Amino acid sequence: MTLPQILTPSIEKAVKVLFDVIIDKVEFQTTRKEFEGDITMVIFPLLKVVKSNPVELGNKIGNYLVENVAEVSRFNVVSGFLNIVISDDYYLDFFGGIKDDVTFGFVTPNPEDKAVMVEYSSPNTNKPLHLGHVRNNLLGYSVAEIIKASGKKVYKTQIINDRGIHICKSMLAWQKFGNGQTPESTGLKGDKLVGNYYVAFDKAYKEEIAQLMSAGKTEEEAKKQAPIILEAQEMLLKWEAGDDAVITLWKTMNQWVYDGFAITYKNLGVNFDCYYYESNTYLLGKDVVQIGLDRGVFEKDPDGSVWIDLTDEGLDRKIVLRSDGTAVYMTQDIGTAIQRVKDYPDVGGMVYTVGNEQDYHFKVLFLILKKLGFDWSKNLFHLSYGMVDLPSGKMKSREGTVVDADDLMQEMTDTAQKIAEDLGKLDSYSPEEKAKLYSTIGLGALKYYILKVDPKKRILFNPEESVDFAGNTGPFIQYTYARIQSIIRKANFDFSNKSKMVVLHEKEKELVKQLELFPEVIQNAAQHHSPALLANFTYDLVREYNSFYQAVPILGEEDLEKKIFRVQLSKKVADTIAASFSLLGINVPERM
């Protein structure tokens, strides 16, 4: 039980006994650093039902708790706040209960509960994953893991945008300029090779536009009449008609991209349970349009196009079917959502990890599904996030200046290597151990820097700053974990049995209090879809541990019971760091 769960019934009873008043809610908050106390009860709300001043009221309740609740040792009242000091016995008992609990903080899913499907990544198959995809993947993966740890079954999915004019641009450019190149013949990852041809198409397209404009065409006319764009449009029509040659090329080049993506995903440490492809889903939803028309949810215009009027909800009119009968993205997303629930009947909610430029789209999508009568629509959530910028500027993919995810990960590993080599202490490492350490530190720095920020906020990502071994960074936390592992390796005595400690040092108590927060932080992070809550909890835990480390001897402690307890406490902190970082997709090194 948590402290609020322990104290609330006793406080309710105290108010009934002392004032003959029944209350149904007790408000708690963390005790401010300048006051003594482990938890604070807010007195002000009670003044509405109890005729007393806050200090008198606080003192009466405090005295009652000291006399009747074993966990309460003393208290103090400051204005309208009752600061409660909890006994060492409570924290020692709590720690004894979690010391060997390898699943501490994690909740086992109930098979009867509905599952959650989390969508993330969802790339186009015409270029490599870039910096924006990195934030998307890290957020989606972490949120999925956190929701799973909170006690829900989770499916990780993505919808791959594998069709359309942008795909045909890469295909056409390869036909024109590729000379039969393959990933094998060039030594390039497949996604990078295909991305090169997307850039090549754009270059040729711009040259043709310039030529047409010099011949007297307007820019708008030139963009429409450039031969290469007309060829790409013709290729798209052939794809839609099922042309064998076009379909074969499409499958071949897409497979190159998938093979490249698989390497990036593996290096980034993310995975998926199921995949959806736009080529299979772009016609989904058209049947739903007729259902919507029959129910009066949609309306048909004279030109045959179908719309939904959401002006009363402040979202304007939205087209769901063009006049020529072709679907729009909204229609596809409606159909895909419905299909997912058909494929996975235990799914009762979905999380869409998509940038904030799509905020309007998802408001409309969720409202349409609600109006169509799907009960699960109330459990849809758009995990909206801001753009990631580098100090050198924003990304552009068509011009070949995109910040590739692969290049970024390599840069992070190289930066970590340079810093680690400058710090020294690597003489005993084999080349393989060094390479693993550099990757662990570099990717840990990247992931933590991105995930510690609230998803809604835009990020200016500074690679060198993220690899700093001091402050709120991944490497700082990893270093603390490795330091604890060193302590455990040096502990040449049995510390497995429960310590007979009876009095806690202030720093020990603060550390146990921080550990106690872990289960609640996981639940809050899941509820708010925010890995930042977990990341910053871990940083606070590490800061508390380093304060403890500086204040008291651990292996140098002469009292055996204290030494045993401090090693056990250190180990539990390390275990909690590792557990928390696992939910963020970050590895921890055994030594640094």
Where are these regions (language model features)?
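Short, charged, solvent-exposed linker or helix-capping segments at domain edges/interfaces
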Residues: 93-98
